[in-house]
């Protein structure tokens, strides 16, 4: 199985907006390799006749009528926010985007 | 803003074929959000329409809105698409705070509708077939306000404020296949397509599709391919182009801009990027470098079960589809006996449905048309409003026209309909409570709304 490369870790880190040092890239490459190796063992038991699944129950079409339900109050909605301003969630400057 | 050199439109087209892709997002007119029961009504009160589901709180479970699915199927059918027998939602992961879940629930490789087309009519009457790649269900994002920057843009902002009232409102994203062969008419095709799609969405009754209110938004993807080459160039994506005129301008601008960029590049490739459209001058500027699809790390949404629309439901919805707008327009043009040019004016004025409604309450078509396309259309145009925002409804028009079967045709004017004569030239007063109005109060409509277009209703307009 191909190992996770340093470059792939650096790419993932960029997507997650994490700044990693050189030695951390190597460290996490090894760790991610181990994790992927562990998950890959599933393929050993799941043969061609087992379709990939995203849900444990064989359900389809669970739908909701288009009826309004009460929302939280703004105070309730914001109660878990680390910071707020003008009844809005306050977040740090968004870097690297425009 | 930096000044960008533009190649002349003709020069760019002499070397390249434009290849376009259009992505249109339609906000559905459902009462509730796509995955929770929060209201979709537009409210100024920030974060007043959120719940654990649309805030992405741990343990909250989304359930899909049935009308959202039904609307998606209707749109798919009207676009001549196949409707998936089985499809799933997917998480689109990205690092941006406009979704509190840190992902957008969307569809990826299993859209509910795919492989369709929409025939659009160009100004000279030619029909251009736009192939549809897919229409899929997803949800809208929250609204960010950037604080501390000079212009309210992200650049230079110290922090951002998030209102999640809009987060989770149902969206249908409609994606075309690459539109090729339009050549110099590419911008016109883009505009005609978005216009036709808007009419279709309105006819289906799934959204009001008001572009100026963000209920319908268009991304214009464009690449240029040197004549005779097979491969597409690297595309640019101009986001959130929000009027028909802007769709045309953005496409035109990008053809000229891409032309310059390609000429400068020896290898003929330019970076895939997101561009922002500027309403003021019709230009676009570079935004972020786009992540590739794989960078969104799409995976099937484990909190939602698959959607498998029963075939009899799909067929029932197919039977209920309205007459296609293009065919309806052709029929009405025939019935009303108007020229292509006049029909275009009626369309541009947004008067089709009003005229139809007016004939349905008893007015002859030609008088109904003159009623709406005369002073009312001019007034709407001058005051920058839609015809149906003037407070005039079709119901009382026949009476106002003093229409009697067999009566000799009469000359239509606003004063003939009992309106104070000079109203259309008294825009500065902004209401009809003038001396003329006091002497001869305008007839109020059934709803009690003053029918005078320029009127900001005051008590004096509503005398019994």
Swiss-Prot record, chain A:
InterPro entries named among the record's database cross-references: Asp/Glu-ADT_sf_sub_c, GatC
Listed Pfam families: GatC
Keywords annotated in UniProt: ATP-binding, Ligase, Nucleotide-binding, Protein biosynthesis
EC number, UniProt record: 6.3.5.-
GO molecular function: asparaginyl-tRNA synthase (glutamine-hydrolyzing) activity; ATP binding; glutaminyl-tRNA synthase (glutamine-hydrolyzing) activity
Catalysis: reaction(s): L-glutamyl-tRNA(Gln) + L-glutamine + ATP + H2O = L-glutaminyl-tRNA(Gln) + L-glutamate + ADP + phosphate + H(+); L-aspartyl-tRNA(Asn) + L-glutamine + ATP + H2O = L-asparaginyl-tRNA(Asn) + L-glutamate + ADP + phosphate + 2 H(+)
Record region (Disordered): 75-98
Protein's UniProt keywords contain Protein transport: no
Gene3D superfamilies with a match to the protein in the record: Glu-tRNAGln amidotransferase C subunit, N-terminal domain (1.10.20.60)
BP GO terms, sorted: glutaminyl-tRNAGln biosynthesis via transamidation; regulation of translational fidelity; translation
Entry keyword annotation includes Protein biosynthesis: yes
Similarity comment: Belongs to the GatC family.
Role description: Allows the formation of correctly charged Asn-tRNA(Asn) or Gln-tRNA(Gln) through the transamidation of misacylated Asp-tRNA(Asn) or Glu-tRNA(Gln) in organisms which lack either or both of asparaginyl-tRNA or glutaminyl-tRNA synthetases. The reaction takes place in the presence of glutamine and ATP through an activated phospho-Asp-tRNA(Asn) or phospho-Glu-tRNA(Gln).
Quaternary context: Heterotrimer of A, B and C subunits.
Protein name (record): Aspartyl/glutamyl-tRNA(Asn/Gln) amidotransferase subunit C
